[in-house]
Amino acid sequence: MKSLLIIALLVSVVYILLCSLAYFFQEKLIFFPEKLDKDYKFVFPQRFEEITIQADDHEILHGLLFKSKNAKGLIFYLHGNAGSLAGWGGVAEVYTDLQYDVFLLDYRGYGKSDGRIESENELFKDVQSAYSQMLKYYEEKNIIILGYSIGTGLAAKTAAENSAKMLILQSPYYSLTDIVKHAVPIIPPFLLRYKLKTFEYLKDCKMPVVLIHGDKDEVIPYNQSLKLKPLLKTNDVFITLRGQAHNGMTENPDYIKEIQKILAE
């Protein structure tokens, strides 16, 4: 009996330690930024300019604005949880070829952006600051918000609180809590400080919504989009990319065909 009590105590201590680590270090478990020197030189085939945005707390955020000839509007792009614009900037060409300018934001702590991510609300405010800055240059009726992977929750939140032309979500999740619950079921959901409730934000999106997901996604399972599908409005669009994994979606010829049709409307 004494041995069982000792084992139970040890298991409890390990579990409490694991939960504590998950709570206090979750930024390191969710976000994987690549830092760039301030004098880093970006190289891309199309025209672009570097943009700085002052966040609410006066940290300076960094973005890239890619320019298209005879642009019909702007793609406001929110990228995934790893890397920086040094890599993510490569997606812009797909959209500039379709006559859309593209703005990409590096979240705080990513690329040349100052600071570090410390809260969900801070992230929301940063994205809104960048969006508000783009409104100085583009009419909102011509702005499409596009989120990829972890950026989908941020994109849906931003769309819910603004009046963009359209919302496009690539590999979205029902909520970050739901992802963690299935990936690491021993961690209580209440410990997660980044909820990113895409399902709640979609309910407030009045603009057309497009969900695009690969059915072989090994990072954000395809069933996450299937859970979101019932929340779509009558004229919203749900697209399945057969055989598509999590990475490389933008280069998928089927994705390009679908996005051509969507942006031609």
What feature does the model see in each segment?
Residues 56-133:
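Membrane-embedded segments
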Residues 198, 207, 221-230:
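Short alpha-helix in the alpha/beta-hydrolase fold that links the catalytic acid
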Residues 244-254:
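Catalytic histidine-centered segment of alpha/beta-hydrolase-like enzymes
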Residues 252-265:
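Catalytic active-site module of serine/aspartate enzymes centered on a nucleophile-bearing elbow/loop
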Residues 205, 211-213, 217:
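Short beta-strand/loop motif that positions the catalytic acidic residue
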Residues 7, 11-54:
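An N-terminal hydrophobic leader/cap segment in hydrolases
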Residues 216-220, 246-247:
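Acidic catalytic loop of the alpha/beta-hydrolase fold
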Residues 133-184:
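Primarily recognizes the serine-hydrolase "nucleophile elbow" in alpha/beta-hydrolase
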